[in-house]
């Protein structure tokens, strides 16, 4: 494992996510200045996900052919342009254009993951990829509160600050980050690979156990993405929180996420079977989403956010982990590709659906809808995943007390 290259790319990821997290919580406030209602704000958030769904796979293939470094430079330059356009926006359509430009060039994270795979060996790869989660959490601790603070001078200021982060990233990559793929490796990787087609996805969904996990991931993804994408709009509409106050709340959520991902997941998966934890997290999340829907005050909301973040973070990790254990080693890449496509679809559906529910029914509706989805998922998982022979087959490996590979 090349620690210098790994440290360099993790720094690039952190700076990129810092810029992203500066902006994301402020979009509903920015859109409101152009008289956008909740549904239109949901469309604004979804426009980025739609563009990213189109752009990220293309950028990923281009990075295989032309190398990680030039495509990462192009991707972050697109992010830079999107943030600048966001800062100078004087009409709602320009906000949409800014998010679409950022989304279509938004392959930053997937290319960084590929770079890490290039510079780590099989033993250390999981550890290297896990550092992205740490960078993500740290970015979401610092970014929202910084963006909220800067917004007191206008919403354009955080946008230009995010653009500055992207410019710094361009300089870091240009002057400091070497290419990770040799010409020989690029030639090998241009061999045509099986596409993640809609037909292939339907075939995967019909498989007895892994198909059930993918369906569970979709249902969980819709409920959790509604919480993530609508939260700022919910905070503005229900509690009239300022952008700065929402930033403080999201920083609190970021701290909870870092604790969950960095500490709790490893501890509890060494004690409990994964299917038991999945069922428990679904139940906890369903209950906490009822609390989110009905929270009468910000204090109650902060209390409710703790189990929501805990259950959501653990469940997201467990569904991915169980999915990779449920298929043959040569199928892992393909099944994770399907999971990524499902995640992208939930980030498109959730903000539109959540915005419509909030506008038409009220601030209680997104949380209530999420709770209903999670309650249905509870019974589905109990029937299809809990105590399944495949889960029981890898139970003993998980509980062994000498988990060197588990820690990696």
Locations of regions flagged by a protein language model:
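Conserved MFS/SLC helix-loop-helix module at the cytosolic interface between two early adjacent transmembrane helices
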Residues: 53-92
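Helix-to-loop junctions at the C-terminal end of transmembrane segments
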Residues: 56-67, 260-274, 358
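Cytoplasmic helix-loop-helix junction between adjacent transmembrane helices
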Residues: 97-137
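A membrane-interface helix-boundary motif in multi-pass transporters
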Residues: 151-164, 356-374
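Juxtamembrane intracellular "pre-TM" segments in multi-pass secondary transporters
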Residues: 178-215, 399-408
């Amino acid at each position: 494992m090349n620690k210098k290259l790994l440290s360099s790319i993790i720094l690039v990821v952190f700076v990129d996510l810092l810029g992203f997290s500066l902006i994301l919580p402020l979009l509903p406030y920015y859109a409101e200045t152009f008289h956008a209602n909740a549904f239109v704000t949901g469309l604004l958030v979804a426009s980025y996900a739609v563009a990213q769904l189109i752009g990220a796979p293309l950028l990923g293939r281009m990075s295989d052919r032309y190398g990680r470094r030039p495509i990462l430079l192009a991707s972050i330059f697109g992010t830079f342009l999107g943030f600048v356009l966001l800062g100078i926006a004087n009409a709602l359509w320009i906000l949409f254009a800014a998010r679409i430009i950022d989304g279509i060039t938004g392959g930053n994270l997937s290319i960084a993951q590929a770079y890490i795979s290039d510079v780590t060996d099989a033993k250390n790869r999981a550890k290297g990829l896990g550092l992205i989660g740490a960078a993500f959490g740290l970015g979401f601790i610092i970014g929202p509160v910084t963006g909220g603070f800067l917004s007191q001078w206008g919403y354009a200021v955080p946008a230009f600050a995010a653009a500055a982060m992207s410019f710094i990233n361009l300089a870091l990559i240009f002057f400091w980050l070497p290419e990770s793929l040799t010409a020989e490796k690029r030639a090998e990787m241009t061999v045509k690979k099986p596409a993640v087609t809609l037909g292939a996805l339907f075939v995967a969904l019909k498989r007895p156990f892994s198909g059930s996990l993918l369906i569970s991931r979709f249902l969980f993804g819709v409920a959790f993405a509604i919480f993530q994408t609508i939260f700022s709009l919910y905070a503005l509409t229900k509690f009239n929180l300022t952008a700065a106050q929402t930033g403080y709340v999201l920083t609190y959520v970021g701290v909870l996420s870092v604790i969950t991902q960095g500490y709790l997941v490893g501890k509890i998966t060494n004690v409990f079977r994964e299917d038991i934890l999945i069922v428990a997290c679904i139940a906890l999340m369903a209950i906490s989403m009822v609390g989110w829907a009905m929270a009468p005050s910000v204090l109650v909301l902060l209390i409710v956010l703790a189990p929501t973040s805990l259950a959501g973070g653990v469940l997201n990790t467990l569904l991915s982990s169980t999915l990779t254990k449920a298929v043959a080693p040569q199928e892992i890449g393909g099944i994770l590709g399907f999971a990524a496509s499902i995640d992208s679809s939930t980030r498109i559906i959730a903000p539109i659906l959540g915005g419509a529910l909030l506008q038409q029914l009220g601030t209680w509706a997104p949380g209530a809808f999420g709770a209903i989805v999670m309650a249905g998922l509870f019974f589905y998982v109990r029937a299809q995943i809990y105590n399944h022979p495949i889960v029981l087959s890898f139970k003993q490996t998980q509980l062994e007390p000498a988990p060197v590979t588990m820690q990696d």
